[in-house]
From Swiss-Prot:
This is Neuroglobin. The keyword Transmembrane does not apply. The gene is NGB. The lineage of its organism: Eukaryota, Metazoa, Chordata, Craniata, Vertebrata. Disulfide bonds join 46-55. It is found in: Cytoplasm, Cytosol; Mitochondrion matrix. Its EC number is 1.7.-.-. It comes from Homo sapiens. Monomer. Homodimer and homotetramer; disulfide-linked. Mainly monomeric but also detected as part of homodimers and homotetramers. Interacts with 14-3-3 proteins; regulates the phosphorylation of NGB. Could interact (ferrous form) with G-alpha(i) proteins (GTP-bound form). Pfam families: Globin. One of its GO terms (biological process) is oxygen transport. It comes from the Eukaryota.
């Protein structure tokens, strides 16, 4: 896999990182629209959410969104040395497997990430920027998938 274009990623992330909760909410709203079967995986204090809107307004889920955006931020920060995050990302993969997330769902997460970036950046979300983010996300998922494989 080619290395992602670091400057395109950093530049585009600057706009997103100004409002991580807002943009993270767009990402998860899109995720639940594309793959509604993921909603039951998110339970806090044994509480099942009745709708994506119910989940997206929950303080516990908003905390999850913040954490996801921090992981993306770490990937952006380390875009030129993602190997420094390998162990952390594999551990994150194991945690997601343990709560019932299927590895195949990360394809939908990737689509949702690109959707959020496009909504946030508008015309600045060029084909080159999309390609750079796709490469970065692919590398992150590859590292996380080691948590499924038990490596």
């Amino acid at each position: 896999m080619e290395r992602p274009e670091p400057e395109l990623i950093r530049q585009s992330w600057r706009a997103v990182s100004r409002s991580p909760l807002e943009h993270g909410t767009v990402l998860f709203a899109r995720l639940f629209a594309l793959e509604p079967d993921l909603l039951p995986l998110f339970q806090y204090n044994c509480r099942q959410f009745s709708s994506p809107e119910d989940c997206l307004s929950s303080p516990e889920f908003l905390d999850h969104i913040r954490k996801v955006m921090l992981v993306i931020d770490a990937a952006v920060t380390n875009v030129e040395d993602l190997s420094s995050l390998e162990e952390y990302l594999a551990s994150l993969g194991r945690k997601h497997r343990a709560v019932g997330v299927k590895l195949s769902s990360f394809s939908t997460v990737g689509e949702s990430l690109l959707y959020m970036l496009e909504k946030c950046l508008g015309p600045a979300f060029t084909p080159a920027t999309r390609a750079a983010w796709s490469q970065l996300y692919g590398a992150v998922v590859q590292a996380m998938s080691r948590g499924w494989d038990g490596e």
